[in-house]
Amino acid sequence: MKENKGRKAFSEQGECSLCHNIKPIYNRRHSGQNLCKDCFISSIEKIINKTISKYDLLTPIDKIVVGVSGGKDSITLLYNLKQIQEKTYNAKPLSAISIDEGIENYSSTRLNIVKETCKELNVELKVVSFKEYTTKTLDQIVAIQEKHESFRYPCNYCATIKRRILNDLAKELEGTVLALGHNLTDVSETYLMNILYNRLHLIARGNILRKSSNLTDKYIDRVFPLMKIPEHEIELYVNLKKLKYYGPLCPFRKEHPILRKRVLHFLNELKKTSPEIEFNLFNGSLELLSVLGEKYKETAPHYCPKCGYPTPSPTKCRYCSL
């Protein structure tokens, strides 16, 4: 009943909650605001700026490297960081990284959008492929691995390789921070996944905040400036701004029902009656981080005998074990 009442109230609302001049096009259910196009766009950009400021994600002297896939999130991130960089006195130029996984009928189309966007924004772009790094495309890796009993979802292999490439390239480009397009929905999903798998040590790391390791210089700092914006709002923003992006999901994600997909469905069901649920999860993760910080203090890691990267055991790291 309450939900229907809320919809009715929105349909009868004749003005934007912020400017009070124009008819609204969007009802932000978690705040109760009805927003016109311009106020909605402005609110998204303000949230990004406020998130960066509140959580100390970036500094004026940072050399920012942006991971860009060509999807709605990374395009939104790149566009907004470019605007911020242009308004920041003496700011270093942005650089972007995009990765060609070698997925048939997917990677090349997506990369064309990335190249076009970076050219329009005058952002340096570095493209590297899985094949350059591993001698194989993701299609080839999956074809080999799925013959073994130990086969895991393609996403596991892809994520491991991408993390390494992004980190290595960002350092190669002399970046001080790697900015990625993880949104509030992504952060909430990951938090729930870590709870479900009892990975409290990962929550304790505080990966959603900028945090440098005192024990290794192998990793570049990572930040998520979109982490306070729900996925559906980013989709609306990028369409209202008419920013070109690649919409189709990765074919492997569609073919393989990974747990993350089920968690997303669960979250979307909860949001129907509790639109603030993702914000509650975000705030809860920060509170739990402060509690777990003492228990899971950073300890001296082992190092992979092959690549020298930190690893939890004396054996090869996950990347080198692929």
Describe these PLM feature segments.
Residues K2-R205, K228-L240, C317:
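ATP-dependent adenylation/nucleotidyltransferase module used to activate substrates
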